[in-house]
UniProtKB/Swiss-Prot annotation:
Main function: Potential odorant receptor.
Cytoplasmic side: 47-54, 121-133, 218-237, 293-314
GO biological process, one term: G protein-coupled receptor signaling pathway
Glycosylation sites: N5
Main subcellular location of this protein, as a coarse class: membrane
GO molecular function: G protein-coupled receptor activity; olfactory receptor activity
Membrane topology, record value: Multi-pass membrane protein
Extracellular topological domain residue ranges: 1-25, 76-99, 155-196, 259-271
Residue stretches spanning the membrane: 26-46, 55-75, 100-120, 134-154, 197-217, 238-258, 272-292
Species whose genome carries this gene: Mus musculus (Mouse)
Protein name, as recorded: Olfactory receptor 5G9
Record-stated family: Belongs to the G-protein coupled receptor 1 family.
Subcellular location: Cell membrane
Database matches in SUPFAM superfamilies: Family A G protein-coupled receptor-like (SSF81321)
Length: 314
């Protein structure tokens, strides 16, 4: 429990992004565009998968959940970030900060583990195609989605509760544009070595377990593809995985850089710059990656547009 001699923090103030005043409107419009594309792209992907029966497969079942998580993940940070561009005081209440950090950690963990579930799905599809429909049963698919939500809940409950139960010093200035764990820990008066270790272990465990699942899956996938004799067969096999590999590489590269490297707590300004990429850009890129590089999605979009035109004519 916090010592009574410590100042009770009722709100936090964000330093936010550092930029030239002349860029204020431009950056606001840019991040607003990112958010709108994120919302429309991911919502469109969910609707497309829902209405097109040919996309009712395990792969697109996982993709629809990934799109849902991207919408939620982006909405945890973007609305507050956008309003702060024109706010004289970039403030957030203590409870608001707790909730923002809680949901942020929740959805980040889910996204990582969903990508691992999708990698396993690709492994079964390419390495055991004859058993695919049996192996990837509806029950297993549901379990591979519920699992990430359960782990995400445990992940965020663990380090968020451990951090916010500690006493904060008089300063309430957060060197970030949202309530991320690293700058929050820098404001705590108590010994935070256990908290740092907890973040490193819990966040690291999620990243390492999910990334190991992905690496092992793609190792077997690569071996299976190299055994395919025809160049056309290898090309088709690679094309089914290329979108997922691209999304994984972008997300995991930034997350490992911020949360797993030992100097993550001290490099707050650098973390803030990199955080822009994975909070604003990655949720926007995922639907673009999976639509522009996926023939099935593009075909489904064409069929849906054609049906819509017929419906409007009638």
């Amino acid at each position: 429990m916090a010592d009574e001699n410590y100042t009770r923090i009722t709100e936090f103030i964000f330093i936010g992004l550092r930029y030239h005043p002349n860029l204020q409107v431009f950056l606001f419009l840019l991040f607003l565009l990112f958010y709108l594309v994120t919302m429309t792209g991911n919502l469109g992907m969910i609707i497309l998968i829902r209405v097109d029966s040919r996309l009712h497969t395990p792969m697109y079942f996982f993709l629809s959940h990934l799109s849902f998580v991207d919408i939620c993940f982006s909405s945890v940070v973007a609305p507050k970030m956008l309003t702060d561009f024109f706010a004289d005081k970039k403030a957030i209440s203590f409870l608001g900060c707790v909730l923002q950090q809680w949901f942020f950690g929740f959805f980040v963990a889910i996204e990582c583990l969903l990508l691992a579930s999708m990698a396993y799905d690709r492994y079964v599809a390419i390495c055991n195609p004859l058993l695919y429909s049996v192996a990837m049963s509806q029950r297993l698919c549901i379990q591979l989605v519920i699992g990430p939500y359960a782990v995400g809940f445990f992940n965020t409950m663990t380090h968020t509760t451990a951090a916010f139960r500690l006493p904060f010093c008089g300063s309430n200035i957060i060197n970030h544009f949202f309530c991320d764990m690293s700058p929050i820990l820098s404001l705590i008066c108590a010994d935070i070595r256990i908290n740092k270790l907890l973040v490193f272990i819990v966040a690291g465990a999620v990243l390492i377990v999910s990334s190991t699942t992905i690496i092992v899956s793609y190792f077997h996938i690569l071996i299976a593809i190299l055994r395919i004799r025809s160049a056309e067969g290898r090309r088709k096999a690679f094309s089914t995985c290329s979108s997922h590999v691209t999304a994984v590489s972008i997300l995991y590269g930034t997350l490992f850089f911020i949360y797993v490297r030992p100097s993550a707590i001290s490099s707050l300004d650098l973390n803030k710059v990199v955080s822009v990429f994975y909070t604003a850009v990655i949720p926007m890129l995922n639907p673009l990656i999976y639509s522009l590089r996926n023939k099935e999605v593009k075909s489904a979009m064409g069929r849906t547009v054609a049906k819509a035109k017929v419906f409007l004519k009638n």
